C-alpha cells in the first residue's frame, strides 16, 4: 500500500470498516505522511449503529475541503448525530464488546474446524467468518430450517459454495455449532 501511495498520482482510499476487529493497525497514524491518502471508517460495525448510516472520512485538509464543497448541506440529521454522540461516549463499552467478539470469533473458528463438510475457513479480521462448504445452498437451507440465519455468498465473486457466519454471543455460536454438527452427522 505504501508503494501505491508513493507512486500513484491520485487518491488512495482505504476502507477501514472492520479495523476494530483486526490485528492490523489503522492507517490513521500515517495520514500526515501521505497527502493522497483517504481513510473511511463507519459506526456500523464495532459501534453497532448500522441503522444510522454514519461514516467518517479522514484525509488531508485539502481533500476534506473539496469533500465539504460537494456534500449536500445538513447531510447528517439530528437524530443520527444524537445516536452517534451517545455511542461515542461509551468507547470503553464498545472496546469490551469488540474484545468479546474477537474471542468468540477465535472459539468459533476452532470449533468450525471439526465440521466435516466445511472445506476451507478463510482468515478474517471481521465480525464474521467466511467458510467454503460442500454445497452452500443445501447447507444454507438446512440451517434456515433449524432457525439459524447465515449468509449464502455463493453468488458473490470468488465465493462459490461459501457461507458467512456472523460471530454471535457464546450461546448463539454454540447453537450454530450444534446445528452444524447435527448436519455433519446426518449429511
What role is predicted for each listed range?
Residues 59, 131-134, 167-169:
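Short beta-strand-to-loop capping motifs
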Residues 1-12, 16-46:
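Active-site pre-lysine segment of PLP-dependent enzymes
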Residues 51, 125-126, 157-161:
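Short acidic/glycine-enriched loop/turn segments that link adjacent beta-strands
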Residues 31, 112-113, 143, 180:
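Hydrophobic C-terminal alpha-helix "anchor/cap" residues
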Residues 101-102, 115-146:
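Conserved PLP-binding catalytic core of the aspartate aminotransferase-like
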Residues 145-146, 156-187:
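PLP-dependent enzyme catalytic core of the Aspartate aminotransferase-like
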Residues 36-114, 120-121:
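PLP-dependent aminotransferase class I/II
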Amino acid at each position: 500500500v505504501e508503494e501505491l501511495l508513493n507512486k500513484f498520482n491520485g487518491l488512495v482510499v482505504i476502507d477501514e470498516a472492520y479495523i476494530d476487529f483486526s490485528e492490523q493497525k489503522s492507517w490513521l497514524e500515517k495520514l500526515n505522511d501521505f497527502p493522497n491518502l483517504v481513510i473511511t471508517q463507519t459506526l456500523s460495525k464495532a459501534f453497532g449503529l448500522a441503522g444510522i448510516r454514519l461514516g467518517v472520512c479522514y484525509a488531508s485538509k485539502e481533500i476534506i475541503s473539496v469533500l465539504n464543497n460537494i456534500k449536500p448541506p445538513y447531510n447528517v440529521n439530528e437524530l443520527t448525530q444524537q445516536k452517534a454522540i451517545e455511542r461515542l461516549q461509551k468507547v470503553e463499552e464498545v472496546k469490551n464488546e469488540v474484545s468479546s467478539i474477537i474471542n468468540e470469533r477465535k472459539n468459533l473458528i476452532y470449533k468450525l474446524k471439526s465440521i466435516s463438510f466445511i472445506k476451507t475457513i478463510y482468515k478474517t479480521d471481521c465480525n464474521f467468518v467466511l467458510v467454503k462448504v460442500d454445497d452452500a445452498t443445501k447447507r444454507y437451507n438446512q440451517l434456515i430450517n433449524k432457525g439459524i440465519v447465515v449468509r449464502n455468498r455463493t453468488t458473490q465473486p470468488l465465493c462459490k459454495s461459501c457461507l458467512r457466519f456472523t460471530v454471535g454471543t457464546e450461546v448463539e455460536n454454540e447453537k450454530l455449532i450444534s446445528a452444524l454438527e447435527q448436519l455433519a452427522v446426518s449429511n
